[in-house]
């Protein structure tokens, strides 16, 4: 297993902290006027989702987390588990809702997303950055109703609710940024 020194820490690096796989979100090298230099990192526990801040003296090391990001296709939800499949090997994984978290509102059947596996167990699901979904319910846009220009809420086919411009109607396909949960543009079929 690889070991990373504090000078090798960078954003996105996956390491083991307190016997749990973590991803480094932010890394800062601090050299105070007096005393030894240290590295302050902000990490997200991949199993629980908690974000904590830790400091390490220069020269400290952390073991790498044996995690793998695998592209998988979302198959279906049986009420209790969400089922995913590796397209090349047809290997299937069942994921609980607490692992899926917010990704559930952006997934529809046959979508390809990234599952993070640790000890061959799914611990995180990352939806694609952009998805195209149909609007199932929104208020009708009235002609000339442009004051404020803020938009209106729209319910998508997966149950997610996003703010859309006034000209968008029920039944249209839209492109949504899953990282921010925002409307990007109209989409063609």
Curated annotation (Swiss-Prot):
GO MF term (any one): translation elongation factor activity
Lineage: Bacteria, Pseudomonadati, Pseudomonadota, Gammaproteobacteria, Legionellales
Function field: Involved in peptide bond synthesis. Alleviates ribosome stalling that occurs when 3 or more consecutive Pro residues or the sequence PPG is present in a protein, possibly by augmenting the peptidyl transferase activity of the ribosome. Modification of Lys-34 is required for alleviation.
Modification N6-(3,6-diaminohexanoyl)-5-hydroxylysine, positions: 34
Source organism superkingdom: Bacteria
Biological process annotations from GO: peptide biosynthetic process
Location(s) in or outside the cell: Cytoplasm
Protein name: Elongation factor P
Organism from which the protein derives: Legionella pneumophila (strain Corby)
Family: Belongs to the elongation factor P family.
PTMs per UniProt: May be beta-lysylated on the epsilon-amino group of Lys-34 by the combined action of EpmA and EpmB, and then hydroxylated on the C5 position of the same residue by EpmC (if this protein is present). Lysylation is critical for the stimulatory effect of EF-P on peptide-bond formation. The lysylation moiety may extend toward the peptidyltransferase center and stabilize the terminal 3-CCA end of the tRNA. Hydroxylation of the C5 position on Lys-34 may allow additional potential stabilizing hydrogen-bond interactions with the P-tRNA.
Residue ranges of the TM segments: none
Endpoints of the signal sequence: none
Matches recorded under CDD domains: S1_EF-P_repeat_1, S1_EF-P_repeat_2
NCBIfam families in alphabetical order: efp (TIGR00038), PRK00529.1 (NF001810)
Family matches, as PROSITE patterns: EFP (PS01275)
GO cellular component entries: cytoplasm
Biological pathway: Protein biosynthesis; polypeptide chain elongation
Annotated keywords: Cytoplasm, Elongation factor, Hydroxylation, Protein biosynthesis
């Amino acid at each position: 297993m690889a070991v990373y020194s504090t000078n090798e820490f960078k954003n996105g690096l996956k390491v083991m902290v307190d016997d749990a796989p973590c991803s480094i979100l932010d890394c800062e090298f601090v050299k105070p006027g007096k005393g030894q230099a240290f590295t302050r990192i902000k990490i997200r526990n991949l199993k629980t989702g908690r974000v904590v801040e830790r400091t390490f003296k220069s020269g400290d090391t952390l073991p790498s987390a044996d995690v793998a990001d695998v592209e998988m296709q979302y198959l279906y939800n049986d009420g209790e588990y969400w089922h995913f499949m590796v397209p090349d090997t047809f290997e299937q994984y069942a994921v609980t809702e607490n692992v899926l978290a917010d990704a559930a509102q952006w997934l529809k059947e046959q979508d390809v997303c990234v599952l993070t596996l640790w000890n061959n167990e799914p611990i995180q699901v990352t939806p694609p950055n952009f998805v195209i979904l149909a609007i199932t319910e929104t208020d009708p846009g009235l002609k000339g109703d442009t004051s404020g220009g803020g938009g209106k809420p729209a319910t998508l086919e997966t149950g997610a609710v996003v703010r859309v411009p006034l000209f968008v109607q029920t039944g249209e396909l839209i492109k949504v940024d899953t990282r921010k949960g925002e409307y990007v543009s109209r989409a063609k079929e």
